Amino acid sequence: MPPSPCARCHDQRAVIIRPKNRQKLCRTCFLHVFETEVHETITSTSLFHPGERVAIGASGGKDSTVLAAVLKTLNERYNYGLDLCLLSIDEGIKGYRDDSLETVKRNAQQYNMPLVIVSYGDLYGWTMDQVVAQVGKKGNCTYCGVFRRQALDRGAAKLGIKHVVTGHNADDVAETVMMNLLRGDLPRLSRGTSIVTGSAASDIKRSKPLKYAYEKEIVLYAHHRQLDYFSTECIYSPEAFRGSARTLIKDLEKIRPSSILDIVKSGEDMALLKKVKSQVLGTCERCGYISSQRVCKACTLLEGLNKNRPKTAIEMEIGLEDEESSSTLRRQMEKVELGGV
């Protein structure tokens, strides 16, 4: 059987079958179509404005690496006028994050973008290796998720940046829809499906330019552009519930390729059924960070961790309930050094 021609240009030989719609494309057309679809997502939602400073949440993985490469390309091609930088979080996981950060550092040079790295150790006095040693692997993702969200916000705030973009893709959003549907949690489903998100605890805007991009196509894009990315999964991330949702979605995708986007669209429709009430923002009485509660989630988790530490080890951290401890942590948070810019 002769090779199939590209369905778009009809000149080159097709080398890719798009997972999204089974369309056969040559390398050049696939890359252009992928970039054009991301551009359409950005423009149709008015995601950016000229002159905006935007931090790309960079982990060194395929999603954030592709996001950085595509945004750089589109920023130059369509003259978005964005000031882009890379913002990475060092959770303190030896053999994983230290290696992936080396990839991010190379990306910063390859894309000519400033890089800022914020560490859990500097912000909270705990690395994830230490957290796991204390609480075990079960439930450690809760700590990491809360700490990472606040670390991204703190890093962006230190830079004077009000917009952070992340590499969440269509598969991620579909999994979130499925999990929250099974939980019966419409408010969380609404937050998870929106292309622009944030939280009651932050005035930092977060968005997902790759929201409608399939994970498989992100891998194909990275491969055909020969992007430099880190492919090892986090050693502490079992994600039992999300893993079950992922397996179900992958099985549906095999039967019906459009299933992923169908689930995303259904989630968007369901999100309209319940209006999420806005919360009143204040500041955490311990660390001074924006919070809808008297004590923010990060400080609540840190209090539990620090109860098992000797007093001498936590005098400069959260855990002491007197006023001096709270002001000490606030000063510590304010003095975090952010290099690279």
Swiss-Prot record:
The keyword RNA-binding applies. The keyword tRNA processing applies. It is found in: Cytoplasm. Keywords: Cytoplasm, RNA-binding, Transferase, tRNA processing, tRNA-binding. Pfam families: ATP_bind_3, zn-ribbon_14. Pathway: tRNA modification; 5-methoxycarbonylmethyl-2-thiouridine-tRNA biosynthesis. One of its GO terms (molecular function) is tRNA-uridine 2-sulfurtransferase activity. SUPFAM superfamilies: Adenine nucleotide alpha hydrolases-like (SSF52402). InterPro entries: CTU1-like_ATP-bd, CTU1_C, Ncs6/Tuc1/Ctu1, Rossmann-like_a/b/a_fold, TilS/TtcA_N, tRNA_thiolation_TtcA_Ctu1. It is an enzyme of class 2 (transferase). GO terms for cellular component: cytosol; cytosolic tRNA wobble base thiouridylase complex; mitochondrion; peroxisome. GO terms for biological process: protein urmylation; tRNA thio-modification; tRNA wobble position uridine thiolation; tRNA wobble uridine modification. Its EC number is 2.7.7.-. Its main location: cytoplasm. Plays a central role in 2-thiolation of mcm(5)S(2)U at tRNA wobble positions of tRNA(Lys), tRNA(Glu) and tRNA(Gln). Directly binds tRNAs and probably acts by catalyzing adenylation of tRNAs, an intermediate required for 2-thiolation. It is unclear whether it acts as a sulfurtransferase that transfers sulfur from thiocarboxylated urm1 onto the uridine of tRNAs at wobble position. Prior mcm(5) tRNA modification by the elongator complex is required for 2-thiolation. May also be involved in protein urmylation. NCBIfam families: TIGR00269 family protein (TIGR00269). Belongs to the TtcA family. CTU1/NCS6/ATPBD3 subfamily. PANTHER family: ATPASES OF THE PP SUPERFAMILY-RELATED, CYTOPLASMIC TRNA 2-THIOLATION PROTEIN 1. This is Cytoplasmic tRNA 2-thiolation protein 1. The gene is ncs6.
